[in-house]
């Protein structure tokens, strides 16, 4: 199985696209089987079926509601692996250990 990440920002254009690339690079270096997509906060509900973990800035993360085996990771600096990396790895190792190589 591959853990599916959805990067969410206010407009779905700038920050989430850059965050998508940063998360992809970080998870590749961390040997995690993954896919990463991005969207605007207003579109996340239509993207939920294809996501296991939603990553967003802390002020947007509060607007995101998920149920079941889906998780929201709120981060202060979306572009810094030092900020989002440990939080993302904690969720992946706890809930998706089969994706850690």
From Swiss-Prot:
- Does Transferase appear among the keywords? yes
User: What Pfam families does the annotation carry?
Assistant: PTS_IIB (PF02302)
Kindly identify the residues recorded as the active site: 9 (phosphocysteine intermediate)
Q: Which EC class is this protein assigned?
A: transferase
User: Positions modified as Phosphocysteine?
Assistant: 9
Gene3D superfamilies assigned to the protein according to its UniProt record, in alphabetical order: 3.40.50.2300
Q: What does this protein do?
A: The phosphoenolpyruvate-dependent sugar phosphotransferase system (sugar PTS), a major carbohydrate active transport system, catalyzes the phosphorylation of incoming sugar substrates concomitantly with their translocation across the cell membrane. The enzyme II UlaABC PTS system is involved in ascorbate transport.
Name used for this protein in its record: Ascorbate-specific PTS system EIIB component
């Amino acid at each position: 199985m591959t853990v599916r990440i959805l990067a969410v920002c206010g407009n779905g254009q700038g920050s989430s696209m850059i965050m998508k690339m940063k998360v992809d690079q970080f998870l590749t270096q961390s040997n995690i089987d993954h896919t990463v997509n991005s969207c605007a906060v207003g579109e996340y509900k239509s993207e939920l079926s294809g996501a296991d973990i939603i990553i967003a800035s802390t002020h947007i993360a509060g607007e995101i509601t998920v149920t079941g085996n889906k998780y929201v990771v709120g981060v202060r600096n979306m572009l810094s692996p030092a900020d989002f990396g440990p939080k993302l790895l904690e969720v992946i190792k706890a809930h998706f250990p089969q994706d850690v190589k």
